[in-house]
Amino acid sequence: MATVKELKATARPAGGKGAARAERRAGRVPGVIYGDNKPPVTISVDDTELRARILAGRFLTTIFDVELDGQKHRVIPRDFHLDPVRDFPIHVDFLRLGEGALIRVSVPLHLKNAEGAPGVKRGGTVNIVTHTVELEAEAESIPQFIEADVSQLDIGSSLHLSDVVLPKGVKTLSREDLTLVTIVPPSGYAEELKAAAAGPAAGAAAPAAAPAAGAKAPAAGAKAPAAGAKAPAAPAAKKK
């Protein structure tokens, strides 16, 4: 179940870029809460607190209770913008969560038992093909990450989305045959396989060649009688 975090906000009047710049100069980040068939509410949050939340990771999959004028709004971040030069937040959007509402989120993939995989023990490398998975779930059921157990993967093997057990109440929006992880062979692995395959073939060829070579011996010996047959034809002794 998702952990709900607290975040304090202050209502701000709707305004243009000038009002937003004034908020930033005061150390606050302008934002908005919208959704659930209710009017949007313009807010501002403390710059330091928001930056810490973003840097902590998984910001866009974290549920917040935003406290505003004594009331709490259950929300999930939908977007945020950073200053292109100084890399600090300059705007944030929150989606208001109604009861039982289904939320689409992108959740990171975490690996389990990677070092115990047979392919890794044989020198292979884990290659993460898909880093995030698109899911749909109720707000309280959104997982912080999806765990993929790769303990059975050998060199050349792959793990697909269909091999992963999703938490209860969570549905994937991606293809079931989506490749998540593969084990890449080490350098020179293909040459080793060729050499291993060539070894038995060469061993089988050697015994077959031996009889062929031996078969020539009788043929060579067969010529000996022919040479000996000429011996009686030597000149006879002259008569006196």
From Swiss-Prot:
GO terms, molecular function: 5S rRNA binding; structural constituent of ribosome
CDD domains for the chain: Ribosomal_L25_TL5_CTC
Top-level division of the source organism's lineage: Bacteria
Region annotated Disordered, chain positions: 1-23, 207-240
NCBIfam families: bL25_bact_ctc, PRK05618.1-2
Main function: This is one of the proteins that binds to the 5S RNA in the ribosome where it forms part of the central protuberance.
Complex and partners: Part of the 50S ribosomal subunit; part of the 5S rRNA/L5/L18/L25 subcomplex. Contacts the 5S rRNA. Binds to the 5S rRNA independently of L5 and L18.
Protein name: Large ribosomal subunit protein bL25
Species classification: Bacteria, Pseudomonadati, Pseudomonadota, Alphaproteobacteria, Hyphomicrobiales
